[in-house]
Amino acid sequence: MSIRSALGPLLLALTAAPGLAANTAGLSPEMWQRVKGAEPATVDLAPTPSEMAPDRLSLRECVVLTFQHNAGFRQSLQQLVNARGSLWVADQRALLTAAARGEREQSPGGEPETNLSSGLSMRYNLTTGGSIVVDAGTGTQETLADIFTQQPSLVLSYDQPLLQGAGLASSTYERIRSARASLALQELSFFDSRQDLSERVIADYFGVLLAQGEVDIAKRAVDRAQQFYDISYVKFSGEGVVKPGETWIGQVAEIDVDQARLSWEQSKHQLISRHQRLRDAMDTLLLDVGFTPTGTPELTTVITYQPQEYEEAKLIPIALANSTDLGRLEINRQDGLAQLRIALSERLPDVIASVGVTDLGDTLRGVPVSTGWFGGIRMEVPLWDRQRSENAQRARRALEVLDQNTTATRDRVRQDVQQQIRAAVSSRARIDIGEQSVALAGKSREAAQGMYDEGLSDYLRVLDAENRLVEAERSLLQEQVQYFLTTVRLRKALGEDVTQGLPD
């Protein structure tokens, strides 16, 4: 069998050899599937003009639209696409090169000569460290007809390191492994940035709902203060509601009406401030989503309180198995092991085995030449090199530090889960107390109003009861929002996709 007939099947078999396994960063299969599932199938980075927000927005719609319009998120998409491209480049193992030369020369005392030559070379690098080289050439000819009609030369060779740079320490294997590790790191970073952006938009959305709720509370306070002022004025003046400054019936009556008026004005002042906070919160939400910060879309998702029970003993192992921080450290550990493997390989003798065959074809201008072959071993032994020894020591020290960082990170993951569980439990307890406080403050407000109407107390008692009711309503609303955001942070700490299961 000639080398031409054996070349095709050989290269096909080498090309079809299995590649490196995908880097899963030591994460659980469910978590890695979640990370991969968060990546978009297609990426369009073309700039788009700012758009107006729709008239109605749910929380789920806000999160989805954020991934389409947020400018900062596109940078994460770009980095992910770049990492994919780097792996595509690193995984190129076959290099194909074509060359041609044509010149006309005349030696001293000789006749002008035309020299034409062309060649095609292919090199295929194996992850074992070896390389297959195929060279085809025409030799030097005088006419183009000779180049196109002759049988070209063919050289097939195979070089394989036996010690230094062999196997997992080969440059080809390490190049592909490093690119896949970089892609895995970027995939984890993309998932984290997606989680962070989702958490921020959810917090913005509920910040608007909180501001809207505080506006509603302030409106009710203004209405109650105005009604009480009207009642006080009619009660002690015997006339209809008019502007202050008239002659009052007694100093006590004048003080009560002034206090009622002051309470009314303070309530209106609070309402103006709450409206400003609502506008600021809405602008923040629209900017984070990627919309023009104008308009006031209706937010259709409402604040709901759904208490849940959490078991720390069950959640901590889940968080450890799904932690992207631990996943990054595992990838860094794989990089450190690779550096140690390469450093130890560099201390070994450089032994390369070579074998090949040659077929010159008709390139020697009609001189018949039979097929030849070659084979041998080349060896270089490093006798003394401080740098190679130091490289191995540095790799070992880096791994030791990395192991300590892994231990500390595992402790931080546990602490984060414990902290979020404590926050959820505390928030749930404060909500229960807040609901009772609102009910008691409402009763106290009604009782104070009744005592004032019967002349058993002055307005200061009513004012104090009113302030307590407003504060209780506001605190309860804040705790309900805080509880929901705490559950979002807990899901994030557990490695769950916070975009899933959002209320409509």
What are these regions (language model features)?
Residues 74-78, 91, 127-151, 162-188, ...:
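Sec/SRP-type N-terminal targeting helices
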Residues 8-17:
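Bacterial N-terminal signal peptides
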Residues 47-54, 101-158, 298-312, 341, ...:
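Small/polar, glycine/serine/threonine/aspartate-rich low-complexity segments that form flexible
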Residues 274, 324, 479:
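Metallo-beta-lactamase
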Residues 458-478:
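Short terminal targeting/anchoring segments
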